[in-house]
């Protein structure tokens, strides 16, 4: 099992020690052209997590490839690059330009990208033709039938899934009766997302049996094992990294007495899972 960061929740160049405490680092989503993102304020705390409306702020493909990626490689960390865009060719062209990395995560929840099963499959198929690198499709549980989207991207050539992206939410300032975020709504993340993530991972693993990076409200070793029990092969940390940068090391310590690889194998085999649970109870 790999422990990763959720895209956009950690800057490896400014916090290399935290990045090195993970098994692999996932970059912010890269788009063909630079994006400044949304007007501040674009982050707001909630009772059980946070909202963000960053707007895919990033340096753009060319600067990332020629400036950021070489510096990330110097850190000696296995790299996953998150790729975004607004049409299939945006994704495919960036994928074609990437090499010497561990995997590509396709952010299929970008603004203005229709995440219907056929659109997601079209993007994955275009990227599959453009690269031989492993492709992980990142999906949002906001879709009416996330398992159907998972099946579609699997058929189109995805090697794995990243589940889940944020859900749309709203925070209000009662003094002004205006949204806290300048954009209005934002992506909800944090502990409140975990039950949704568990359900999505369970449904998509049952539908595809693809390797899954589970994420959404992970803050403890128990959270990690719950996602694995639902079918995740790897786990990513997101919002917790803002409040507890030492979370990767702490979670590893919490899992020290568990044979995680045995648990992963058991979670993918119902009979073994029952045996493993019996051992835990004993």
Where in the sequence are the language-model features?
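Glycine-rich beta-to-alpha transition loops that act as phosphate-gripper elements at the mouths
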Residues: 8-9, 82-86, 139-145, 164, ...
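Conserved, mostly hydrophobic/aromatic
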Residues: 5, 25, 64, 81, ...
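Active-site beta->alpha loop and helix N-cap motifs at the rims of alpha/beta catalytic domains
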Residues: 47-116
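Catalytic cores of alpha/beta
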Residues: 14-19, 89-100, 143-156, 202-208, ...
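Alpha/beta catalytic cores of nucleotide-metabolism and tRNA/nucleoside-modifying enzymes
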Residues: 188-212, 219-282
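Glycine/Thr-rich beta-alpha phosphate-binding loop at enzyme active sites
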Residues: 50-51, 108-118, 149-210, 250
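N-terminal capping/small domains of soluble enzymes
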Residues: 1-78
């Amino acid at each position: 099992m790999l422990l990763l960061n959720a895209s956009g929740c950690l800057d490896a160049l400014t916090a290399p020690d935290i990045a090195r405490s993970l098994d692999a680092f996932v970059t912010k989503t890269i788009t063909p052209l630079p994006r400044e993102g949304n007007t501040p304020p674009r982050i707001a705390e909630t009772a059980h997590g946070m909202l963000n409306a960053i707007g895919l702020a990033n340096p753009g493909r060319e600067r990332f490839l020629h400036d950021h990626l070489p510096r990330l490689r110097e850190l000696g960390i296995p790299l996953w690059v998150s790729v975004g865009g607004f049409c299939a060719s945006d994704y495919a062209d960036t994928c074609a330009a990437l090499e010497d990395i561990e995997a590509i995560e396709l952010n299929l929840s970008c603004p203005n990208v229709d995440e219907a099963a056929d659109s997601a499959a079209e993007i994955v198929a275009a990227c599959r033709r453009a690269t031989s690198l492993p492709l992980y499709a990142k999906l949002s549980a906001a879709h009416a039938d996330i398992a159907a989207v998972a099946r579609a991207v699997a058929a189109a050539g995805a090697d794995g899934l990243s589940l889940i992206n944020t859900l749309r939410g709203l925070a209000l300032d009662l003094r002004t009766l205006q949204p806290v975020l300048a954009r209005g709504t934002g992506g909800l993340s944090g502990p409140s997302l975990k039950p949704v993530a568990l359900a999505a991972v369970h449904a998509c693993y049952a539908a595809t049996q693809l390797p899954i990076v589970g994420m959404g409200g992970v803050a403890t070793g128990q959270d990690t094992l719950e996602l694995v029990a639902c079918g995740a092969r790897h786990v990513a940390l997101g919002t917790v990294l803002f409040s507890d940068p030492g979370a990767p090391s702490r979670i590893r310590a919490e899992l020290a007495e568990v044979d995680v690889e045995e648990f992963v194998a058991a979670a993918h085999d119902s009979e073994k899972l029952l045996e493993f649970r019996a051992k835990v109870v004993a």
